[in-house]
Amino acid sequence: MPLNEVSGNAFPRTVLFDLDGTLLDSAPDMLATANAMLAARGRAPITLMQLRPVISRGTFRIIAVAFPELDAAAIQGLIPEFLQRYEALIGSVSKPFDGVEMMLHALECAGTVWGIVTNKPEFLARLILPLLGWTSRCAVLIGGDTLAERKPHPLPLLTAAERIGVMPTDCVYVGDDVRDIQAARAAGMPSMVALWGYRSHEDNPMTWQADTLVEQPHLLSRPDVWPST
């Protein structure tokens, strides 16, 4: 029996994950960063409830929540400060979502190769890997600035598959944002929505045309939950 077959059900040969909101609950670190910027200006902090729905939308949206009165140019001007402060705080309070380690262990035991494709700047994503013990386990890491394009463009997913040495159709991509699913569909990869991630009230994953929607990470420890590749 091949390594990735268990009781007649197969894990995928390769799985690619989004990072923030899929593998990592990074909202606490980002909240601390935004509130440090507010405190430096003598302003009141924001709450996790305010910030959580936009975490997957990137730094610009996070700053926009913290400083709603600013125009786009002013928000853009604060991005370097946010990234510098975030780099100093990264990993201090964030952790994998419950069930993620169980899932990764099950994949590894089945012989499945896994990697990360995120829109987070690559240097920040690489800082996280050793903190979680993932450096040698993660087969590929593509950040939002690694290539000329980022999600929802398919290039990051296609490049990740190429670097691992598999066809895109042999991969499954798991993410919590509509751009993740758009990128996977454009790359020809089966996709799964991580419903535990960072979504706003306006988001409706049922309309994203993913292959599967999954409620919790631990469910992905079962081979029968995964779409066929």
UniProtKB/Swiss-Prot annotation:
Positions with a binding annotation for Mg(2+): D18, D20, D176
Enzyme class at the top of the EC tree: hydrolase
Presence of the UniProt keyword Ubl conjugation in the record: no
Pathway(s): Organic acid metabolism; glycolate biosynthesis; glycolate from 2-phosphoglycolate: step 1/1
Any one annotated GO CC term: cytosol
Family listed: Belongs to the HAD-like hydrolase superfamily. CbbY/CbbZ/Gph/YieH family.
Name of the protein this chain belongs to: Phosphoglycolate phosphatase
Organism the protein comes from: Xylella fastidiosa (strain Temecula1 / ATCC 700964)
Encoding gene per record: gph
